[in-house]
Design a protein with these regions (language model features):
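N-terminal flexible segment immediately upstream of the FAD-binding catalytic core
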Residues: 1-62, 79-109, 258-267, 309-335, ...
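Residue-level signal for inorganic ion chemistry
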Residues: 5, 64, 116, 178, ...
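Alpha-helix capping/hinge segments and adjacent helical runs
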Residues: 10-14, 408-419, 433, 444-454
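C-terminal substrate-recognition/cap domain of FAD-linked oxidoreductases
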Residues: 15-34, 218, 224, 229, ...
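Conserved, mostly hydrophobic/aromatic
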Residues: 64, 204, 447
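FAD-binding subdomain of flavoenzyme oxidoreductases
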Residues: 100-254, 469-476
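Activity-critical C-terminal alpha-helical subdomain
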Residues: 179, 424-476
Length: 476
């Protein structure tokens, strides 16, 4: 396999070094962290390739389809669900060498970047020109443009700027059979279905994204932040709903339950539930929005506390150390689970999830963010310690079984922005319903050999005859 790839791609692109294979056997999914710490390697690629051009990606996929070799795309490995793990061995296509900014269009407010571009680098380069992506996931300093598209990501400022599906204007993709596809480069079109949306969230199962054109925005001239205390979860959720209902567009609206508020505010004695609220843009408009938003919060029993806690959160918003440090301990247990629902169901879903998950962790923290006129996401963080890493791995499985059962019973989206990966595979067929068969037909048409991230999204794998020299015991 390696010699075939080297003949196809030339020197310096293909690796079968043990350290490279090991590095591409784990992402930052907590279960994968526990595997690593126990010396387990359920998934291992046979080779890693680092293409430098769309032509090289095309050659790899055409060859893999012809030879029936599994291919798994890899951005920067920051997935928390197992999405980039090579569950059937084969070739990992690491996109990190394709990291150029191809164009910045200041007239039409667009940037075109290759899929391996690190998010925070792109944001800084745009900031130097006076622009922002408006897309700011917690993983901005460790995730790639292609990874955002593959997982259907959302940033912390999505309530103003939109999620990744709202920000992508066009993309280039190589199908599993090696064809290059470029979606129309227009602000909008009515020429049939919007094909780019088919690939946003596909987690590499329908091909590999090689570059993306995104919207950009002028840096705001003015920003206001506030921390608001509410007595009850119901009060803060009601304020969020009304803020969105009347048409305000805060860039930041995060509401924490009492358990997470103590962490978010940084005060173990904090009583109540905290909201971080932020508006930005043209000064006059931002000030008007701020006044209305605070008035709404007060009408729902909220008490403004000043901007300090919200400002401190802005400074540390990419910090993932609480979860990472706990997972690094033998027996340390940490997990994040995000779902979404309509306003009339979100509180029942929240209470049911908190109750179902309480037996499995010392702390179950909850917050609401990524807010829409119709509903909101709900993000849960579980923290605890058990006897050892094997027990932690088993406990994580129980946590997901409990969380997904509750989400499905309540009709919630089983993921808002982390994606499916490996961890949600047992639940996706039920979540998609009759749409699963349609997606399977699309997969069969684009990937007749079944080689592109096989098994992900619960799609037919077409594993008969797939070549793989390695790969560990299957987890899926």
């Amino acid at each position: 396999m390696v010699s075939e790839l080297e003949a196809l791609l030339g020197p310096g692109v293909v690796s079968a070094r043990t350290d490279d294979l090991l590095a591409h056997s784990y992402d930052v999914w907590p279960v994968a962290t526990k595997w690593r710490q126990q010396g387990k390697q359920p998934f291992r690629p046979d080779a890693v390739v680092r293409p430098a051009s769309v032509e090289q990606v095309s050659r790899v996929l055409a060859w893999a389809s012809r030879e029936r070799i599994p291919v798994t795309p890899w951005g920067l490995g920051s997935s928390v669900t197992g999405a980039p793990l090579p569950t059937h061995g084969g070739v990992v296509v690491d996109m990190s060498s394709m990291r150029r900014v191809l164009a910045v269009d200041e007239t039409n407010l667009l940037v075109r970047a290759e899929a391996g571009k690190l998010g925070i680098e792109l944001e800084r380069e745009l900031g130097a020109r006076g622009y922002t992506l408006g897309h700011s996931p917690q993983s901005l300093d460790r995730s790639s443009v292609g990874g955002w598209v593959g997982t259907r990501a959302a940033g912390q400022f999505s309530s103003r700027y939109g999620n990744i599906e709202d920000l992508v204007v066009a993309l280039t993709l190589v199908t599993p059979t090696g064809e290059q596809v470029r979606t129309p480069m227009v602000p909008r079109a009515a020429i049939g279905p919007d094909l780019k949306q088919l690939f946003i969230g596909a987690e590499g199962a329908l091909g590999i994204v090689t570059d993306v054109t995104l919207k950009i925005f002028p840096l705001p001239e003015h920003r206001r932040l506030e921390t608001v205390r509410f007595r009850r979860v119901e009060d803060g959720v009601g304020a969020m709903r009304e803020i969105m209902r009347v048409g305000l567009r805060p860039f930041l609206v995060r509401f924490y339950d009492a358990d997470e508020s103590r962490h978010a505010v940084g005060d173990p004695a904090f009583a109540g539930c905290a909201m971080f609220l932020g508006v930005e843009g043209v000064r006059a408009v931002a000030e008007a929005e701020f006044k209305v938003a605070v008035t709404i919060c007060k009408a729902h029993g909220g008490g403004p506390l000043g901007p300090a806690a919200a400002e401190a959160w802005m400074d540390r918003r990419f910090d993932f150390s609480t979860v990472e440090n706990l997972l690094a301990k033998p027996g340390g247990l940490a997990e994040t689970i995000e779902v979404a629902h309509f306003w009339d169901h979100i509180l029942r879903t929240y209470r049911a999830l908190k109750g179902a998950l309480a037996p499995y962790a010392a702390e179950v923290l909850g917050h609401f963010s990524h807010v829409y006129p119709q509903g909101t996401s709900l993000y849960l963080i579980l923290l605890g310690e058990v006897a050892d890493d094997a027990t932690a791995e088993a406990r994580l499985g129980k946590i997901w079984e409990a969380a997904m059962s509750v989400a499905l019973e309540h009709g919630a989206a089983i993921s808002h922005h982390h994606g499916v990966g490996v961890v949600r595979l047992p639940y996706i067929a039920r979540a998609l319903g009759s749409g699963a068969a349609v997606l399977g037909q699309v997969k069969a048409a684009l990937d007749p050999a079944g080689i592109s991230n096989p098994g992900k999204l619960g799609l037919p794998m077409g594993l008969d005859g797939l070549r793989t020299a390695q790969g560990g015991d299957s987890y899926v």
